[in-house]
Amino acid sequence: MQVTEGQLVALQDARFALVAARFNDLIVDRLIDGAADTLRRHGVPEEHLELIRVPGSFELPLAVQRVADAGRADAVIALGAVIRGGTDHHQYVAAECTKGVAQAMMGSGVPVSYGVLTVETVEQAIERAGTKAGNKGAEAALSALEMVDLMRQLEA
């Protein structure tokens, strides 16, 4: 059986858009740093990285869709942090963000990596933004790199 899968290879010609929420910026800025650092370490030049900020995670899908439809990037990385508050509001934001980002990817055909944290506490968010549980922004960047390589293989 032939197996085709993306590799974590240097993609010096690939362009990546990081679409990130400003809300919970203490956390999201660390996700951005992790994603950008990972891309640079894998050979992506600074001029091939674009950061687009939106007010919050609920607004991520529209910006992701526009970037993907415009052909501005070979992959988009969605970054945000949805943290439980005193109501169920976080559940609605997280669900719609997830659905919207997935729809943007499927509608555009451009890989979108999902680096949006959905957590119960600020402490959990901090753990996932570069401490105990790694950096989910960096993990999303690795996924984006692999998907760009895979899409190129599938087009060949």
UniProtKB/Swiss-Prot annotation:
Binding site for 5-amino-6-(D-ribitylamino)uracil: 23, 57-59, 81-83, 114
Top enzyme class: transferase
Pfam families per the UniProt record, alphabetical: DMRL_synthase (PF00885)
GO CC terms in record: cytosol; riboflavin synthase complex
Catalytic reactions on record: (2S)-2-hydroxy-3-oxobutyl phosphate + 5-amino-6-(D-ribitylamino)uracil = 6,7-dimethyl-8-(1-D-ribityl)lumazine + phosphate + 2 H2O + H(+)
EC number of this enzyme: 2.5.1.78
Record-linked PANTHER family: 6,7-DIMETHYL-8-RIBITYLLUMAZINE SYNTHASE, 6,7-DIMETHYL-8-RIBITYLLUMAZINE SYNTHASE DMRL SYNTHASE LUMAZINE SYNTHASE
Role description: Catalyzes the formation of 6,7-dimethyl-8-ribityllumazine by condensation of 5-amino-6-(D-ribitylamino)uracil with 3,4-dihydroxy-2-butanone 4-phosphate. This is the penultimate step in the biosynthesis of riboflavin.
Name of the protein: 6,7-dimethyl-8-ribityllumazine synthase
